Amino acid sequence: MNLNFMPLLHAYNHASIDFHFNSSARDFCVHEVPLYEFSNTGEHAVIQVRKSGLSTLEMLQIFSQILGVRIAELGYAGLKDKNALTTQFISLPKKYAPLLEKNTSNFQEKNLKILSLNYHHNKIKLGHLKGNRFFMRFKKMTPLNAQKTKQVLEQIAQFGMPNYFGSQRFGKFNDNHQEGLKILQNQTKFAHQKLNAFLISSYQSYLFNALLSKRLEISKIISAFSVKENLEFFKQKNLSVDSDTLKTLKNQAHPFKILEGDVMCHYPYGKFFDALELEKEGERFLKKEVAPTGLLDGKKALYAKNLSLEIEKEFQHNLLSSHAKTLGSRRFFWVFVENVTSQYVKEKAQFELGFYLPKGSYASALLKEIKHEKGENNDEF
């Protein structure tokens, strides 16, 4: 497989929309939504922190320096953008809580502000978040492009969007996935095991994005062409599908087609199951009750079946499935964007957008779908 970055297909077919977006504290805000309510009792203080111009790891370093707490004692649910105004929850041993208020000015000097203090019985761990609320401000937006953007947002609010990994997974030079493959091939290795694991996960992410783009291509072909033309297409690709199945696929109202053997999952979380009744699962997908998942290949990965597996095989890799420390998993192919709000400020030529995404989904994927700009792999959030 070609490891150079290829353009990823969009879900919708509108022309590109021209505007300017700058990932900055003024124009990009991220607010973490916790996975559970905090009990207000327990041995761990839980603080909500607002930061600007700092990565999460830089923020943790500041807390360690000011409070004298070891970084290993600090808990956080996920990494938040540096070039944004963000809020997130941090846990630390209860004994450090009295030092928080005493050091308010020291935190403010570092662009940190503690918004709330609570307590809980366990440390916050990676993944302990429900999702994130986002705010984005687009500039140099004409009234016509604002109208186009609203129309695109209506489609996205109705059907959702592709759950592509954002380019921060792939590094400044878009080559992390190549380094990950070299590690799997024993051509290179780094001293820090976490770095090795991250680079391997970048390769998984690259394959996932490529598979998702391929599935979008197939969905578009099914929708655009007749059953007879589709039969010829699938025959040329050596994919097994009959005319009755193609009729069922064409009748699915959602732009992303559910194929026989897809690994589905109840949305936004739940158990995996195989898509066997295509009409039924297509309707449930349209109602946002379930969603199809894509492969993150690894030793214990769950694989698709039937037609879905025939397509997925191209994006499997025996070095991933045999790598002892790469277990593998599934990731939603598709996510539903919630609480979409927008406002066009004509006198400033600015468009303000608010929305919610579940954990693991990227605001850059939404920006990509709105903007339809070539070379979107340069996004940084």
From Swiss-Prot:
Q: Which domain of life is it from?
A: Bacteria
Coiled-coil zones: none
Question: GO MF terms on file?
Answer: pseudouridine synthase activity; RNA binding; tRNA pseudouridine(13) synthase activity
Q: Does the keyword Isomerase apply?
A: yes
**Keyword terms:** Isomerase, tRNA processing
Q: Transmembrane ranges?
A: none
Q: Which GO terms describe its biological process?
A: pseudouridine synthesis; tRNA pseudouridine synthesis
Q: Which SUPFAM superfamilies match?
A: Pseudouridine synthase (SSF55120)
Start and end residues of each TRUD domain: 160-335
Q: Any idea of its EC number?
A: 5.4.99.27
Per the Swiss-Prot or TrEMBL record, the active site comprises 81
> Can you list the disulfide-bonded cysteine pairs?
none
Q: Which Pfam families does this chain map to?
A: TruD
Kindly list the GO CC terms recorded for this protein: cytosol
Job description of the protein: Responsible for synthesis of pseudouridine from uracil-13 in transfer RNAs.
- State the family named in the UniProt similarity comment for this chain: Belongs to the pseudouridine synthase TruD family.
HAMAP family cross-referenced by the UniProt entry:
TruD
- The protein in question is named tRNA pseudouridine synthase D
Per the UniProt entry, what species is this protein from, by scientific name? Helicobacter pylori (strain ATCC 700392 / 26695)
Give the gene name: truD
